[in-house]
Amino acid sequence: MIRFAHVSVLNLENAMRGARNPLASWDKSDSFYDEQGNYVLGENDLNLAVRLAKAGSDHRKFIRQIFVSVDITAPLYWWKEFDTYKVGTVANSTSTMHKIHAKPITAEDFSVDHLTLESAKFFGLIIDYLESVRLEYMETKDKALWYELIQLLPSSYNQMRT
């Protein structure tokens, strides 16, 4: 399970204006803001953006001026793959370290949609055990139990990052 929320695309207007700087073709820009305040990319600007994007990295540098922000909730194993491909990104994540004990550990906290029936039953035992460790930690505040939670947490545990 991967969930996307709160998507924002920012600085499109400035990026398109910058894309027109080399030929001083600002007068050909046809993008505008609609009544709701949304930036609408005009046909001329879209055509320019597509041509520059296809022309190679030297010509598509305007794309690097477009910022995208999104909340992504995904399992830890997915984040390991994602981290391999990201460039020039900054992320703030929910803290497993600080919050793993703050709420009950349930199956809904994990992405396990490809388990066999047998594996799903075993996974239920893992969840039950982790929850029992969490409850004991909440009673005793024994740091060894906290480490046990962190170290036994399956990589299918979902984490949100912005």
Predicted ranges, named:
Residues 1-162:
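Family-specific signature for flavin-dependent thymidylate synthase
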